[in-house]
A protein has these predicted regions:
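Flexible, polar/acidic helix-loop-strand segments at domain edges
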Residues: 171, 175, 320-371
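Bacterial Sec-dependent N-terminal signal peptides
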Residues: 1-30
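Conserved, well-structured interaction surfaces
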Residues: 43-48, 52-56, 60-64, 88-162, ...
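Membrane-proximal, proline-rich intrinsically disordered regions
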Residues: 19-73, 255, 272-273, 459-461, ...
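Long, intrinsically disordered, low-complexity segments
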Residues: 18-20, 45, 59, 71, ...
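Short, solvent-exposed loop/beta-turn-alpha elements that line the ligand-binding surface or hinge
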Residues: 86-109, 129, 177-188, 306-311, ...
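Short, surface-exposed recognition loops and adjoining beta-strand edges that mediate ligand/DNA contacts
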Residues: 29, 33, 69-91, 165-177, ...
Length: 473
């Protein structure tokens, strides 16, 4: 009887989700890949081409909301970089740092990350179960490695946003009354502890079993590479646990392995954002868009329908951010912010309105990882290792490209000032790349920075911000 009741519940949930999908533009996905496994664990793939097709489906997650728009909401709007721009209740919760569990954007981000992780798990497990004599080992291992990279990315963002969270690493067979007790906990899992999630992420980014099978840096391809995996590993190591317990030597080592892959800074910062300059020497992981498959972030951030902006766009630069740029020297200022006229707004004067300028056309790619990010992450780790002069030399190399003198910052400024120098440079260099919120949380600086953040009239916006707001509901 107990199994019959449980089975009825599962069927009912399936019916509800199915019916709701016709009504809800953004339905919440299940955690698992239901029906992709069997009790005797046979692969659903007839050939490696089937695995590659589903792997491509996992890559398509990078063209979903979580990477086309919500990455800016998470990383920039939740920080002192941007105002949201939108007037909806859900949008305003981000702007005010007062997220609720009923916010549809929170549900959207949750469901899309779990869909990405679930598809990657399906690829991993079904490819493992294939008859090894039916595939070329090198290609089979590469497919599994790329799927592990994608799963690691999804769970890294999940654990950074929610902390303890469900983690599903198994396939789900067809559910019957006989096997329901066995699979019910997998279908509806308890939250895994943060440390356990990080263990899994680092296992998926293991050098021996994953990274070795990925391709090396390959210009012009939207694909997981060794450099991208080392970069993700560096970010994970720089984030896990408390600052006092992190192994910053390993962060530096991971960053150095990225650098060893042969990436180089482009000489002109603006080239990174020119739509016809895709996959530069600096790009580590970049999502590709064309006129046939456009980047719709352009429509909400910048697009001008008739030669003038007639409604305020999303992710409006804040007064605090604009004030930090050296407008005379810093070439990144004009490359990152475009000033236009907007008929009405609450943040800026109508005749002088800043727009985020890194997504310039519908064919603009989205750069999710690039060398400057990793160099500055290495600098952050070096400061924590009390090697501040080395860190500031890296910061100065980034600043030199932006138009400053080669030694514009004093290498002997000391650790405390060095921390702030790296933090400030990451903010200006990586504005509108979804990094600022995570930088502040990672370095225990969110509350201090946001409690000093002001609106256009100089009023404090978040004077009473509480620590629990560093995780999502």
């Amino acid at each position: 009887m107990k199994n019959i009741i449980k089975l009825a519940y599962v069927v009912l949930c399936t019916l509800v989700v199915s019916c709701s999908s016709f009504l809800d533009e953004k339905p919440q996905s299940d955690f698992m890949q239901e029906g992709t496994g069997t009790e005797d664990q046979e692969s659903k793939y007839g050939s490696l081409a089937d695995a590659q097709a589903e792997l491509q489906g996992a890559y398509e997650s990078f063209k979903a909301d979580i990477f086309q728009s919500e990455n800016y909401t998470i990383g920039d709007v939740q920080s002192d970089n941007c105002y949201i721009g939108g007037d909806g209740v859900a949008e305003q919760e981000f702007d005010l740092l007062k997220l609720t569990s009923t916010n549809y954007k929170v549900e959207l981000v949750w469901s899309q990350y779990y869909s990405m992780a679930g598809t990657a798990t399906s690829v991993i497990e079904n490819t493992k179960m294939m008859d090894p004599t039916s595939t070329v080992a090198e290609e089979r291992n590469r497919v599994i490695a790329e799927a592990k990279f994608l799963r690691a990315w999804a769970y890294f963002d999940i654990v950074r946003l929610w902390g303890d969270a469900p983690m599903v690493l198994d396939l789900i067979p067809t559910i019957t009354a006989e096997n329901l007790d066995k699979w019910y906990p997998v279908m509806y899992p308890e939250r895994s502890a943060t440390d356990k999630i990080y263990d899994q992420i680092l296992d998926d980014l293991n050098e021996e079993n994953t990274i070795r099978y990925l391709v090396s840096k390959n210009k012009g391809i939207f694909q997981a590479t060794k450099g991208a995996a080392y970069a993700l590993r560096a970010k994970v190591l720089a984030t896990r646990g408390e600052k006092s317990t992190r192994d910053y030597t390993k962060v530096v080592e991971a960053c150095d392995k990225v650098i060893a892959e042969g990436y180089t800074l482009v000489s002109n910062f603006d080239e990174l954002w020119q739509p016809d300059k895709k996959f530069s020497s600096e790009s580590i992981f970049e999502v590709y868009y064309t006129s046939d498959a456009p980047n719709w972030a352009y429509w909400v951030l910048l697009k001008e329908d008739d030669g003038s902006v007639t409604w305020r766009r999303y992710c409006t630069p804040t007064h605090d951010l604009v004030a930090k740029f050296d407008k005379e020297k810093d070439t990144r200022y004009a490359s990152s912010i475009l000033w236009k006229s907007v008929p009405y707004d609450t943040y800026w004067p109508a005749d002088s309105y800043p727009l985020s300028y890194k997504i310039r056309e519908k064919t603009s790619n989205i750069i999710l990882m690039r060398l400057a990010d990793i160099l500055l992450l290495k600098a952050e780790a070096l400061v924590e290792l009390d090697r501040t002069p080395e860190a500031i030399r890296i910061v100065n190399s980034i600043r030199e490209r932006a138009g400053f003198a080669p030694s514009s910052l004093d290498e002997n400024m000391g650790q405390a000032r060095g921390r702030l120098a790296v933090e400030n440079e990451r903010q200006l260099e990586l504005y509108m790349e979804g990094q600022r919120w995570f930088d502040l949380v990672r370095n225990n600086r969110l509350l201090e920075v946001m409690q000093k953040h002001k609106d256009k009239d100089g009023r404090l916006l978040f004077a009473g911000l509480q620590a629990f707001r560093q995780l999502w509901p």
